[in-house]
């Protein structure tokens, strides 16, 4: 068997064994995707025992490409809501992430001085304890530049391997302990997150209002500012027995009934000006009007504003709601359409059919993945991650790397949605498949590389001590920040888990946190909110420690 075929076979074996281990449950808690790392360690140990030669270049490529796939799909998933989340809670989350990095650095410094651990070893243990491979690379580079002996620099990888497993398990353990200590109900936390940060808060309400203000009599709809705002849509007007879709030029009369859509606060403002809320049905049943939901798939309308389509004037059809990535938005005239947007329409059946043709409504397109934007995004991400950032006094340039670059680009592209005929929408099933494939490949290779000397160092060397140091570097910051965030900041548990995973730049921990609730995106959103800054600080921190302690 060729080296390439053998390498692929070993990776498949690692994935099967690791996923099986990940399904084991102890008191309802399992390693999940993190089990792949231990599958890799087991297979790696026996591969070295039986002197199996694997293709090193291929393993390196698979490890990096798997990580790129994982972080890119995470960015595409959370991109639409990332920047709004950053404005709402990003400062608080990133402050906790900074605190975690600082506490981890202090614990590392104390262990280094208290137990006289060689600087290269403690930096390797530190990188493994915080599960950050780019930090290991940065530490190796700066120590080499500072003149550290090559044999000590090479031992950093073993320190990393010793600390990495507990770095993976430790964060899962802390999440579990916080859940037990605070007696947290995950379903309740998910509902609370939805109500305060997204779905339920953004769910639109309706109100039927009777026109009682005589000052409005004789005015057209476009002459009433509140009825033309970006916060409220008037989708139906009832006059006597006639139900119609109001156009911008429709004249308002006293006694008219208006069906309004918007958030409660905005609806109340309109009610105060227009008249009073009434319990009158403005249903389309038994009328010439009907309602329908259509999806935007036509590339020709992507990026266009609802005003520019002029659907009301052309087809006598009103867009009452716009659902984007599970969040309902007011279909204001200034709203731009993105691929996958779901529109609620009101109008005559033939008019709705015409509007459906305009926006696309091709359901099968939602199951297709445009591969060109995927590789454009990955390529741009790799380029961004490769840009060096030179800081005076640091001999090694800082980089976002292959993990940070694709994530940042994916967040931006996910927020933009589309450029011309290119759209970055990805069906949830395809996104999940690529994400899981990426993290399995990454952890399989990390486990294989660590497994060879793992047992020998653990049993005959200083492996146990290194594991202990790593456990402290992992556990103390996580417990400190986790308890503070829950007790003082009253942080949502799922948001907290995502923040902890992002602060540790730990994809397996995010996979575990995502698995705590099947539908909530809270963990992924907070992970992406803190990840870019945390990655930068994780890359900088071992370099700062190396510079500080090299001369001491």
From Swiss-Prot:
One of its GO terms (cellular component) is plasma membrane. One of its GO terms (molecular function) is monoatomic cation transmembrane transporter activity. Pfam families: Asp-Al_Ex, TrkA_C. NCBIfam families: PRK03818.1, YidE_YbjL_dupl. GO terms for biological process: potassium ion transport. Keywords: Cell membrane, Membrane, Repeat, Transmembrane, Transmembrane helix, Transport. Residues 192-276, 279-361 form the RCK C-terminal domain. Belongs to the AAE transporter (TC 2.A.81) family. YidE subfamily. This is Putative transport protein YE4162. It is found in: Cell membrane. Its main location: membrane. Coiled coil: none annotated. It comes from the Bacteria. The chain crosses the membrane at residues 1-21, 26-46, 65-85, 96-116, 119-139, 158-178, 371-391, 393-413, 439-459, 464-484, 493-513, 530-550. Gene3D superfamilies: Regulator of K+ conductance, C-terminal domain.
